[in-house]
């Protein structure tokens, strides 16, 4: 399984990338806007830090606008993946871009049908949203399981990026269900390394060692 960082904070990306567990980065207009910096500059800086797929999202609403923007974004770096919203216009754009060899990440996936349509259109990645589905009482884990089953059954080359990840339990569950990737907010990475028994155990080891060395 691969881990992507779901942030555009360059300092956080640098720090977490040193752990050796980051395979890529995802961003969206909301995440970029929080940084208050030029979109292209931020994406290029991220590409210089992480050697893996870096998702950058279009803001156009028509297929023509998305394609034009995507072609420009794709030129920023070889690792850039263009994020496209799951709409009919988005599917048209994905189809065109996939034929041009531009990698796409179709986002805002909430149903199996949406995921299947994106796969058929040639999406490199699809991003089903875990937390947001749970917010409305929908079984997000079943969606991940169903999408993976379809990919394996029909040999689609699309990979699942489990998004809207909010807890360590989310990461653990989607890993067991076969999501190819989990995209994780930077604060959650720290939580994934921690447990009270680990902290207490290390404290005991150090105390015992200090006593032994006296």
Swiss-Prot record:
Matching Gene3D superfamilies: Aldolase class I (3.20.20.70)
Cytoplasm listed as a keyword: yes
Active-site residues (renumbered): 83
Pathway membership: Carbohydrate degradation; pentose phosphate pathway; D-glyceraldehyde 3-phosphate and beta-D-fructose 6-phosphate from D-ribose 5-phosphate and D-xylulose 5-phosphate (non-oxidative stage): step 2/3
A single GO molecular function term of this UniProt record: aldehyde-lyase activity
Localization per Swiss-Prot or TrEMBL: Cytoplasm
EC top class, as a word: transferase
PANTHER family: TRANSALDOLASE
Similarity annotation: Belongs to the transaldolase family. Type 3B subfamily.
Protein name: Probable transaldolase
């Amino acid at each position: 399984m691969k881990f992507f960082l779901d942030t555009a904070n360059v300092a956080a990306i640098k720090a977490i990338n040193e752990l050796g567990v980051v395979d890529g980065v995802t961003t969206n207009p909301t995440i970029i806007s929080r940084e208050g910096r030029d979109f292209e500059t931020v994406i290029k800086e991220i590409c210089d830090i992480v050697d893996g797929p870096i998702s950058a999202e279009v803001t156009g609403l028509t297929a023509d606008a998305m394609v034009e923007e995507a072609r420009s974004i794709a030129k920023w770096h070889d690792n850039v993946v263009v994020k496209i919203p799951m709409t009919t216009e988005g599917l048209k754009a994905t189809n065109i871009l996939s034929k041009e060899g531009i990698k796409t990440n179709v986002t805002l996936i909430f149903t199996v049908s949406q995921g299947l349509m994106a796969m058929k259109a040639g999406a490199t990645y699809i991003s089903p949203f875990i937390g947001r589905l749970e917010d409305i009482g929908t079984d997000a884990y079943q969606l991940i399981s169903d999408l993976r089953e379809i990919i394996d059954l029909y040999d689609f080359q699309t990979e699942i990026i489990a998004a809207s990840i909010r807890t360590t339990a989310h990461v653990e569950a989607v890993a067991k269900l076969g999501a190819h990737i989990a995209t994780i907010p930077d604060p959650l990475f720290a939580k994934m390394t921690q447990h009270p028994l680990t902290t207490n155990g290390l404290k005991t080891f150090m105390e015992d060692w200090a006593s032994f060395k006296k």
